[in-house]
Amino acid sequence: MAKPAADTARKGHSAAVYLIAFAVAVTLPLLLLVGALLYRSVTLENEQNKQRIGQVLQALVADLDRDMDRRIAVLETLSTSPLLVAEDWPAFYAQAKQGLGSRAYLVLVAADGRQVINTYVPYGEAPKMTGDPASLQKMKQDPRPVISDLFTSLVVRKPVYNISIPVMRGNELRYVMSLGLLPEDLRDLLQGQSLPPNWTAAIWDGNGVTMARTHDQERLLGTAVPKHLTELKPQTVVRTTNIDGQEALIAVARGHWSNWTVDVSFPATLVDRQLNDSLLFWGATILLVGGSVVGLALLFGRTLTRPLAAATAAAGALGRGEPFAIRDSPIREINAVNDALRRARHDLDEGSAALRDNEERLRTAAEAAQFGAHEYDVVRDRTHRSPQFLKILGADDADATATFEAGLDFVHPDDRDMTRRAKQRILQRPEDRYQLEYRICRRDGQIRWVMDRGQVIRDKAGAALRVIGVVLDITDIKEAEQRQRLLFDELNHRVKNTLAIVQALALQTLQTRPKPDEFADAFSDRLGSLARAHSLLTEDSWRGASLQDIVATALSAFKDEGRSIDIGGDAVMVPAGATVTLSLMLHELATNAAKYGALSVAEGRLAVRWTAVPSAANIMVDLHWEEDGGPPVSPPTRKSFGSRLLASSARQLGAELDLDFAASGLRCRLRFPVPRPGP
Amino acid sequence: MHLAGTRVFIVEDEALILDTLQDMLEALGCHVVASAVRVDEALTKLVSLDFDVAVLDVNVAGTRIDPVADLLAGRGMPFLFASGYGRGSLPMAHRERVLLTKPYRTADLRAALHSVLPQ
């Protein structure tokens, strides 16, 4: 069996990876959405800030304009005073001083620049010339209210600004009436907007000199603002460095009356901090969500992968037939797998127990039957032999496997080609079963016969895949078969030989007894004698018979009639062929005695005695047939069947035959050799 | 009857059969010049014996007839077998010789003799 690739276990990714991917897929859009929302809120905030800057700027400008309108209105009201028209300066001074209060002062300058009234100082102490000649010059060209830039007042000795209107007499500028104002008023105006903390509003004059600020008024009053700020486009929020060189969002606007610039700014660090905070928050969210998602995925992945790994290990153990233990899991599907594994183990255990029992029975049966088994794998050209087969072959475990050709090594060389051809034919022919018989040469040199029966297992296309067979040592059967065949051959021969003897008996009897009834009697007698000799031989499996038995059987009929017959001699075995011949001879002698000799009368006596003397080559038997008390004997006149048979039979036995027709009774001496009994 | 006067040599151990064969041959007009009941006896007699045809038993008192058959074949003498065994028992070199299966009739014997004797 091909070993499954170990790489498969490394293929694919852990369930935790998929869980992480799933979590990331789910949370990533959420995190992106949060990011987008955060970004949107930051940009919205930014937008709102910008809008707010614009609004604040507009409000400031409007406030400034309104303030100036009011101041101009005050000035215009004063300019219509009859006291001014009447040029009653002390009264006008008093009126003005009273009307303006402490935060502002009135300066009236004649067209030639000479100060007429200055309410900052007591009447009559006004400086000679104006401190704000620029406003006078402007008004001379265009008689309209003028808002001055910051200048240092001659009387206040501090930076101040003027709001001035022309006082006309006809088309001629007569006086310039100015309201002297301290920048603190502007600061108050700026601060009156109650800006959020960190916001800064500032005003600088047409020369780019700071007039008022919500913060650091004292420090920066009268200082010039950086040039890039003066060049800013109005009503546009830009990000640039402020007066302190810090990044800020800044917008500027110009008022209706003055060429002053109002500036509102707030530090970019605020915006940046918001952005940074949002980014920080977003990053923290990502880290937190991502971390917890991955952590949870790993955790869940472990609850998933751990029992899976346990199930995998259990499945491996199941495959190897080793024990395993698996715990219940919180996951239903894995419990189903575990259950399936336990069931499989249970079934396998039962199955393998049954299989073991079966195998045991089969092996016992095969051993009892002395069957050797073999299995030939056609594809790999490999034969596997069972231990019992190896026992039959007299081989050891080294021969447990072999190729097709090497498997034939045990076959007897004479049978090898036949067996090889037969086995090759088995693989190709359509039948699936086969039976062969051949000889094998065992390792110990013994030659044994085996029967090899088996079956070919094929694939669907009919190609042979395996051959499974059993081998049985049939040497004993084969030898028995051979013995039996020999026995049959021998039997066939003996029957034919006996028939030939019967034929000879018939032909010989016919020559001396041509009359049918006489022939029948004589032939039957001789057949009977032959039959009794055969019976004797059959008793000892045709190995032969004892001489005692041969003689007793030949004479049994006469002994039964009560004749005096004396039989006796040494114990000696006569071989089969000689037994028949000797029986027929004794039968002829007895027949003759019954007709003409001692057995024909009641007082006749017969003695058959013998000795058996062993010599180097064989045993010499010396048998004496002696008749007494019968009628007088005379030699036969013609050669009878009996005498011819005796002569030729003696020759057959290699015997010396002496016949003595003595008057007292026939004497017959027969000396013949029999083989010494085998060991 | 041209078998008349044919001189025959017999090797046969069974006395009765030997006698009967002898009678049959004489009935056919043959002359049995000699017979042997053992192989060694046959080989001894063959040295100086003059005859026309031999009738041989195959298993002679436990000894195979092979040396006798070989000797006769070597001399180019005609002979036939008379045996109770089948053809498979004949000497390998003489498997194709005429075989008279026991028991046989006189007519069988005559035909067998005719088939081995030169015409």
What is each stretch, according to the model?
Chain B
Residues 80-82:
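Hydrophobic/aromatic residues positioned on beta-strands within the core alpha/beta folds
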Residues 63-77:
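Short amphipathic alpha-helix used as the core "switch/output" element in two-component signaling
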Residues 15-34:
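Two-component/phosphorelay signaling modules centered on CheY-like receiver
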Residues 102:
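A Lys-centered signature of the CheY-like receiver
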Residues 35-53:
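Acidic, metal-coordinating helix/loop segments flanking the phosphotransfer/catalytic sites
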Residues 12:
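Conserved acidic carboxylate
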Residues 1-7, 40, 105-119:
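Non-catalytic signal-transmission and effector/linker regions of two-component phosphorelay proteins
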Residues 57:
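Active-site residues of response regulator receiver
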